[in-house]
Amino acid sequence: MTGPILSGLDPRFERTLYAHVGKEGSWTLDYYLRHGGYETAKRVLKEKTPDEVIEEVKRSGLRGRGGAGFPTGLKWSFMPKDDGKQHYLICNADESEPGSFKDRYILEDVPHLLIEGMILAGYAIRATVGYIYVRGEYRRAADRLEQAIKEARARGYLGKNLFGTDFSFDLHVHRGAGAYICGEETALMNSLEGLRANPRLKPPFPAQSGLWGKPTTINNVETLASVVPIMERGADWFAQMGTEQSKGMKLYQISGPVKRPGVYELPMGTTFRELIYEWAGGPLEPIQAIIPGGSSTPPLPFTEEVLDTPMSYEHLQAKGSMLGTGGVILIPERVSMVDAMWNLTRFYAHESCGKCTPCREGVAGFMVNLFAKIGTGQGEEKDVENLEALLPLIEGRSFCPLADAAVWPVKGSLRHFKDQYLALAREKRPVPRPSLWR
């Protein structure tokens, strides 16, 4: 059963996170204040308790926008109360998933929205220090964040006794160095501590023992920014949009051969058809597959049934895929699916930290080698079967989901496009070249 899925063309919805993206000077404090900036944080800190903020976010149905989709309010509630320890809030801005680029524009164009969201989140989880871990390649984003933090601190919006209350909160920017693995929350914390960015074994979970062994919450950029309109307009406003299990607005990204690739802020549950044809202007050439939520999500065939599927957590799970970050990638017919998956496998193999044997040997070793055989015309049918049999031996057997991220798209491609693998193996021919984006 689903709730009301508001159309992206429906006058009842309006953009909140991207309302000022692309506007001149939108990254400055003066611009943000002219448009009501920090008024929500000021009111909430004076009128609501931390527990009331958590309950409001729970009622809104906000789920993590970084890929996992865990309920945000529930995650916050895991933080201990009155334990006398330092609490930390971390914003994961290490946006490195191929096909994902939504957070970059929040960081670059509306950094004060993120800062206000982190003030609200920090208040809710009783954290007094926050860190924003920015992808190393996002230099402009990091520069603007640092400038925004400096502006906010100078006006008293960060630091001691915010808005005349007894709540203190400050922020710091940490620039990454280009490692995809740092997007995993425990590897990110190790990196912040100055250690090698290897993932940690869980439990203990970050809420019990996180950054420097202290209670910590890690949220995505879009997640934290969404807290501001929720606390401004209320949980009911947010929950009226979307589906039964996927509430509110979502930043959908679309890339590949479409007329208008980009980021579109639309209600959860918008269909692929609406995103691709009504917003992105339609494909530029024949399409064979859709990757629904960034490169780690299983691809789906480009069929009428799939096009009419709502882009929500529950609907895509029912289709054997995932919403992920909402980064839709279109694969044209002229591109070999084997080549596309081979390329992704090489990416994940390169980004593996090498800590866990299933990832180090399974992905960077066996998967890469099997793809090399099949893709260069030296494979046999048994290599395709071996690849298929290998995947469950890797999935779910490592400290972090990087190995799973390598397995899932290949698993989906074998489910829907296995004939392409078998054709290459039987005919002893390499993947068609050039298999490149125009």
UniProtKB/Swiss-Prot annotation:
NCBIfam families: nuoF_fam, PRK13596.1. NDH-1 is composed of 15 different subunits, Nqo1 to Nqo15. The complex has a L-shaped structure, with the hydrophobic arm (subunits Nqo7, Nqo8 and Nqo10 to Nqo14) embedded in the membrane and the hydrophilic peripheral arm (subunits Nqo1 to Nqo6, Nqo9 and Nqo15) protruding into the bacterial cytoplasm. The hydrophilic domain contains all the redox centers. The subunit can be separated roughly into four domains: an N-terminal domain (residues 7 to 72) ending with a glycine-rich loop, followed by a Rossman-fold domain (73 to 240), a ubiquitin-like domain (241 to 335) and a C-terminal four-helical bundle containing cluster N3 (336 to 438). Belongs to the complex I 51 kDa subunit family. [4Fe-4S] cluster binds at residues 353, 356, 359, 400. Keywords: 4Fe-4S, Cell membrane, Flavoprotein, FMN, Iron, Iron-sulfur, Membrane, Metal-binding, NAD, Quinone, Translocase. Its main location: membrane. GO terms for molecular function: 4 iron, 4 sulfur cluster binding; FMN binding; metal ion binding; NAD binding; NADH dehydrogenase (ubiquinone) activity; quinone binding. SUPFAM superfamilies: Nqo1 FMN-binding domain-like, Nqo1 middle domain-like, Nqo1C-terminal domain-like. It is a peripheral membrane protein. Its cofactor is FMN; [4Fe-4S] cluster. This is NADH-quinone oxidoreductase subunit 1. NDH-1 shuttles electrons from NADH, via FMN and iron-sulfur (Fe-S) centers, to quinones in the respiratory chain. The immediate electron acceptor for the enzyme in this species is menaquinone. Couples the redox reaction to proton translocation (for every two electrons transferred, four hydrogen ions are translocated across the cytoplasmic membrane), and thus conserves the redox energy in a proton gradient required for the synthesis of ATP. The Nqo1 subunit contains the NADH-binding site and the primary electron acceptor FMN. It is an enzyme of class 7 (translocase). FMN binds at residues 75, 92-96, 180-185, 218-220. Its EC number is 7.1.1.-. It catalyses: a quinone + NADH + 5 H(+)(in) = a quinol + NAD(+) + 4 H(+)(out). Binds 1 FMN per subunit. NAD(+) binds at residues 66-69, 97. PANTHER family: NADH-QUINONE OXIDOREDUCTASE SUBUNIT F. It comes from the Bacteria. It is found in: Cell membrane. GO terms for cellular component: plasma membrane.
